[in-house]
Amino acid sequence: MDVTAKYELIGLMAYPIRHSLSPEMQNKALEKAGLPFTYMAFEVDNDSFPAAIEGLKALKMRGTGVSMPNKQLACEYVDELTPAAKLVGAINTIVNDDGYLRGYNTDGTGHIRAIKESGFDIKGKTMVLLGAGGASTAIGAQGAIEGLKEIKLFNRRDEFFDKALAFAQRVNENTDCVVTVTDLADQQAFAEALASADILTNGTKVGMKPLENESLVNDISLLHPGLLVTECVYNPHMTKLLQQAQQAGCKTIDGYGMLLWQGAEQFTLWTGKDFPLEYVKQVMGFGA
């Protein structure tokens, strides 16, 4: 790829960032489509995020992806949020239109799309959702919008717990889905929720390096063959949770599905063009 002075810059702001496959995936897609953009990753934490957004405007960047730990904070630095992003309370995509910043969340649509592409119909189903960060709440919100009957959200009593309660209230007030929030330390409630669940989704970083030997499911007998287990983590590709699920006879969806579909939507938001899906799946080895 020969970058010229006509190229526009798209970023990814997160910390840590060096594990991300998004720059490789997006640049392969941009090159295949012959579009004058280049995508770069920047290590940006909460403290440096405000300055990074000012830099985005000053450099007239086309936009940026936003990942941990900035997804919720980023909502405060855009001029407009989509209705779904307001429901989530977090964004993973910023589009810069001549200094006017629009915030989107493609995590939820990407993950739910991956589930649908597997042939699973979420309408009327119950999901056990682990975590209350930006990715997890995006998945929950989009699932509620698209027909989930119930979401049982489990999170530790950490800094995200009150945010989880606020998220549940927003979804309960604006959709037909019923969301409850329970402390993950209540293992009896967790076991009962899994017994009646159709989907278990990990929206936390547990399972991602350096936590690759950990899972929030402490007892594999809680997983049953009728359960669909989905993962947001893609590094490593096969997390401990997915290994447990396969041993228990569950159908599984790895983190590549969400990465691919959320990235495809981001690509279109930034460029206005279709994402070369099959090409990217092939060159990135997704689904192989």
Curated annotation (Swiss-Prot):
It comes from the Bacteria. Keywords: Amino-acid biosynthesis, Aromatic amino acid biosynthesis, NAD, NADP, Oxidoreductase. Substrate binds at K71, D107. GO terms for biological process: amino acid biosynthetic process; aromatic amino acid family biosynthetic process; chorismate biosynthetic process; shikimate metabolic process. Pfam families: SDH_C (PF18317), Shikimate_dh_N (PF08501). It catalyses: L-quinate + NAD(+) = 3-dehydroquinate + NADH + H(+); L-quinate + NADP(+) = 3-dehydroquinate + NADPH + H(+); shikimate + NADP(+) = 3-dehydroshikimate + NADPH + H(+); shikimate + NAD(+) = 3-dehydroshikimate + NADH + H(+). Coiled coil: none annotated. GO terms for molecular function: quinate 3-dehydrogenase (NAD+) activity; quinate 3-dehydrogenase (NADP+) activity; shikimate 3-dehydrogenase (NAD+) activity; shikimate 3-dehydrogenase (NADP+) activity. Its EC number is 1.1.1.282. NAD(+) binds at A132, G133, G134, A135, N155, R156, R157, D158, K205, C232, V233, Y234, N235, G255. InterPro entries: Aminoacid_DH-like_N_sf, NAD(P)-bd_dom_sf, Quinate/Shikimate_DH, SDH_C, Shikimate_DH-bd_N, Shikimate_DH_fam. Pathway: Metabolic intermediate biosynthesis; chorismate biosynthesis; chorismate from D-erythrose 4-phosphate and phosphoenolpyruvate: step 4/7. The actual biological function of YdiB remains unclear, nor is it known whether 3-dehydroshikimate or quinate represents the natural substrate. Catalyzes the reversible NAD-dependent reduction of both 3-dehydroshikimate (DHSA) and 3-dehydroquinate to yield shikimate (SA) and quinate, respectively. It can use both NAD or NADP for catalysis, however it has higher catalytic efficiency with NAD. Belongs to the shikimate dehydrogenase family. Homodimer. HAMAP family: Shikimate_DH_AroE, Shikimate_DH_YdiB. PANTHER family: BIFUNCTIONAL 3-DEHYDROQUINATE DEHYDRATASE_SHIKIMATE DEHYDROGENASE, CHLOROPLASTIC, SHIKIMATE DEHYDROGENASE. This is Quinate/shikimate dehydrogenase. The lineage of its organism: Bacteria, Pseudomonadati, Pseudomonadota, Gammaproteobacteria, Enterobacterales. The gene is ydiB.
